[in-house]
Amino acid sequence: MGNGWHEWPLMVFTVFGQCVVGGFIVLALALMTGKLSREQEQRVVGSMFGLWVLMGIGFIASTMHLGSPLRAFNSLNRVGASSLSNEIASGAIFFAVGGIGWLLAVCKKLPAGLRSLWLVVTMVLGVIFVWMMVRVYNTIDTVPTWYTVWTPLSFFLTLFIGGPLLGYLLLRVAGVDGWALRLLPVVSLLALLVSIMVVVMQGSELATIRSSVHHASALVPDYGLLMAWRVVLLALALACWCVPQIRGRKPAVSLLGLAFVLILAGEMIGRGVFYGLHMTVGMAVAS
């Protein structure tokens, strides 16, 4: 019992991965609109470097969970049969296709037609990657606290909360602005509202889940307090993002960076609670 912080490598991997997928989708859609100049397009492509840095950090963290980086190769032994193998494989493919395509685009070796195909394929691979993350946890019927609709909702809501802000931040770094970007905070705000509903409904459901030795609600005694802190951090992040725009100003890049750090902190708290809720239907409860 606890708050799940012992699983911090997985927390970093899943939260960073979901935010990166969301951020890539934002940048890809910006490039595919055809409204950017060639110079702006090249700057946007260059800003994608930030995505791959975060994804690299996530994968490094995931190998720490395995105990040794060499074990990462063993985790691919059952692709197609194991949810864990599928998660690692789909993430590696997303990372490889996205990273190699990005390198070719930065070096101006990727024709316009192929670039559009690369963007679409990588977006699809990213969504598949997040879904494979969900399947690792949502297919274990002996863990009733994960075997619920709240698992896929929580994972994809992280994509919709953190992805738009990360994409907006990188677009601002690239010097791109426009009315369409004003819709991105709305996406994150709506996702936050849905996330709050999920927290409330999941919290009420925990009281009904029990094993032969434990109640689910006792796994993370501070569930309500931790989730309240999560919501506060996410709300502060959106305030840093939205308030300047409401006042008719562009948010400073430094302020957007702070907002993204707050998003990461909030989502890490939520993901820690998720791992802290691990329990089985038998006699044992993970410590």
Residue ranges and their predicted role:
Residues 265-273:
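Intrinsically disordered cytosolic tails
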Residues 1-57, 276-277:
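N-terminal signal-anchor module of multipass membrane proteins
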Residues 14-18, 90-92, 97-266:
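Long, contiguous internal "core" modules enriched in hydrophobic/ aromatic residues
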Residues 29, 57-60, 166, 170:
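Alpha-helical membrane-inserting segments
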Residues 50-109, 123-126:
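Long, hydrophobic/aromatic-enriched structural stretches that serve as scaffold segments
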Residues 1-10, 39, 63-85, 134-152, ...:
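Membrane-interface interhelical loops and short amphipathic "cap" helices
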Residues 32-36, 107, 172-173, 177, ...:
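Membrane-interface elements of multi-pass transporters and channels
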